[in-house]
Amino acid sequence: MVTLTIDGRTVSVPEGTTILEAAQTLRISIPTLCYLKDINEIGACRICMVEVEGYARLVPSCDSAVSEGMVVYTSSPRVREARRVNLRLLLSQHETKCTKCTRSGNCKLQQLTNDYNLLGDHYIDDLKNIPTDYSNPVVRIENRCVKCMRCIQVCEKIQGMGIWDLMGTGTRTTVGVAHTRTLGESDCTFCGQCITHCPVGGLQEHDDTGKVFDALANKDRITVVQVAPAVRAAWAEFYHLDPKFATADRMVTALKTMGFDYVFDTDFAADLTIMEEGSEFIERFTHRNKYHWPMFTSCCPGWVRFLKGQFPSYTENLSTAKSPQQMFGAVAKSYFAQKIGVDPKKLFVVSIMPCTAKKAECALPTMKDEQGNQDVDVVLTTREIVRMLRGEQINPAVLPETPFDSPLGTGTGAAVVFGATGGVMDAALRSAYYLITGKEPKPDAFSAVRGMDSWKEAVFTIPGAGNVRVAVVSGLGNTRKLMHAIDEGDVDYDFVEVMACPGGCAGGGGQPIHDGQELAAYRGDILWSIDKSAKVRFSHRNKDVQALYREFLKAPLGEKSHHLLHTDHNGWKMPNEK
């Protein structure tokens, strides 16, 4: 152990501990901007500088190890002035039009500027007018970037993609897309993890709120909105409400108040996905020689983009089932439109998702009808819908609860857990077991696939089918390791669930941003608790899904089901795909 003194208080910590970590054990707060524990500890921003007795210069606390007898001052006049100077230098190269930024009120630089009383303009605003590319789901705004390198490190260390890189030298240093490409020319998965780890507004999702406001104002359009499972676990965070109070039903009221004609639950489509994907797995499993193995889930568009861009030879291994989002859109513009007696073209379908990659998915050429109309017209992230609610002065804290509309608003516990890593696998196995044996397993029989472990594997025995070898992975860095293991023959699975974001959709790139915090596990626990208390916990027991098959689709994997609910993953190309 190493003993040192910080601001007059003595503490003993393990050798190798940084000054910042040592201070945290004493609950002494040292401000940071670029720091992300175990990911970005490079001292680039120089905001965490501290004074150490015997050192001529101030040192960055985030990457300076403690030493025996060290005496540290975290807020001396010298330290405070240095932080103010460094903040001013950052502001000199930063677009300070905070009222126009989506991160206003939730910006680390803005917070630090206020904390250090840097009021007024200290530099002439003569930043170059650098055009912003708004053609992709992920948008980078050059003049808001503070060169903290977080996006570079998260993309490389967590997601294993290396899309972002440092370019230029000296005052020309900036962050850009590696290999001098545009983002659209790269193999970016649009997972959005760079956005949720950016401390400022340098990265954001493509804002589509204007399109939705226009649709809501158009009396000739019927607006239909679906709410993804993971959204209900996170939207309350913006309002500092208890998740038990900020229920999905209260969100329904908020959306109805905003003006949506129909508010449905993506859980319905998740149950439908299980019926199709589960049936597809059984078909493949019982006719092994006809298919490529293992079978991969296909509901995460970030993962699908990753596979097609990095391991294209495995594209045939993907389930042909569309994601719940896209199944919902297809059913809404066929079955539901028919049910209410309107032309499908009158429907404007909006998805509220925890995901930025969903914005790219809905625009794929394979996700349109024969006339070229998108099944889903617009995708909003959790952050965007809350901005809209705030813009309409809607306060969920005073709203009553309203149930989802029928018939696309019913979901089971199995559907809710789609938003947590392991949830799709768990739900699929529950119904696959029933479809094979005619008997329902215990709802928690497949709990081995749950939890935040980055790579989980299990073997389950299903009577009449034998052993089913499964794996669950989240985070693209972990996914790359799994794919290499499969490719080299080190592992052998039948069914694999992959989610691009660590922790699954609960930690998606469209979720609320809490700087320095990872809340996927917390949100996932909320979803598992909803499943635990649900009256129905099996997708095949969703009565509205049963009615959909009885009245319209006829059967899983049937002709109409295949036409509406399945897709050809070879029907579109990644930028580098031949």
Predicted features, each with a name:
Residues 159, 198, 336-340:
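Structural motif corresponding to the C-terminal cap of alpha-helices
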